[in-house]
Amino acid sequence: MTLVHTCGNETGDESQNRISEKPVEIEGLVFSERADSQYADQFAIDRYDGGYSLIQVADGTGYLIVPENGKIPKGISKKIKIIKKPVGNIYLAATASMAMFDALGCGDRVKFSGTKIEDWYIPYAREAMENGDILYAGKYREPDYELLVSDGCKLSVQSTMIEHNPEVKEKLEELGITVFVDYSSYESHPLGRCEWIKVYGELTDNRELAEQLFQKQSEILDTIGEQPDTGKTVAFFYISSSGQAVTRKSGDYVNKMIGLAGGSNIFKDLDNGSGTSAIQMEMEKFYATAKDADIIIYNNNIGKDVKSLDDLISKNSFIADFKAVRNGDVWCTGQNLFQETMKIGEIISDFHLIFSGEYKDNPPKYLYRLEGGAEN
């Protein structure tokens, strides 16, 4: 199995990346080093003497991390935002980043959540909200400004969804809250997303731990890469409320995870010409190709209502005639699959266990098999 390091983002639009190839010159600061990046290309970390760091993200924005009691340099570009240490009282509206704060032992840096308690599948986040240690402060597009200001929030970590609501971003900044936009969803390689833990390690003074956690996932992938391709074809999808099959475009990171695990998407060159990864298909068209897939992986993170093979078949009678259904090779994602950004190597390993048949001796953690089919 060959591992390929790729550049660009999910949409294939590499022109979006405006990270400077050279260190940014900042008056009064002496450049020290640029942090290594193995898979990620949507951020860069430049370090300067005196404990200063500059995190650049794909849209060209820079975030200067100023050490505690450090002075803010003069004449800084308007494209550079200031984050003063110690970092805390964070309003976290980028759900995928919670796993990174948690893995670093810095979950307590997050004070406000843009995700409701019932939508968290990371134990720390759910428990912290139950205990009142993390407060719900509204979704990214409708934050509770009064709560954020009254409780001293100075930093908001957002996903790129905030770009669809620029007025919210502007309002937060007007209130003195720096808005950090996480571009990990634009990483073309699955481990590129995981590598963003280095960004959060930089913010929280946990560089070494961040590197160790990333390398652990990278080593898992290296081990899988030494195994031969399984030759198994896979259909990854869910059924929408309107009865359509919703799968992923061929360049999507989930399909890349499937490929890295030794499988292949049953759909070749599937693209909708837009920035979204979701592809909606009429069931008849979907059935024509997906019926021959060796393995079905049902994305239960969306509907959350498939507990058995009968539940799945009840969504559309065509499913009963799928090869994978007849052979008992039907699996579901756990509801925590897409929040566990620091387990990407392990999730790819789970895919490999399924594709290789090794799951019989080593059950996967993030997927479960639906009972039914010829084998059961």
Language-model regions, residue ranges each:
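Structured C-terminal subdomain patch of bacterial secreted/periplasmic proteins
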Residues: 94, 187-212, 295-376
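Flexible, glycine-rich surface segments
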Residues: 219-307
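Extracytoplasmic ligand-binding site segments that recognize negatively charged/polar headgroups
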Residues: 88, 96-98, 113-124, 164-167, ...
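Soluble non-cytosolic domains of exported or imported proteins
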Residues: 138-143, 159-166, 187-194, 207-211, ...
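Solvent-exposed, polar/charged alpha-helical surfaces in well-ordered, non-transmembrane soluble domains
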Residues: 88, 98-102, 146-150, 170, ...
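Bacterial Sec-exported substrate-binding components of ABC uptake systems
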Residues: 7-98, 209-236, 358-376
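A short, structured surface patch at a secondary-structure boundary
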Residues: 53-59, 63-151, 155-161
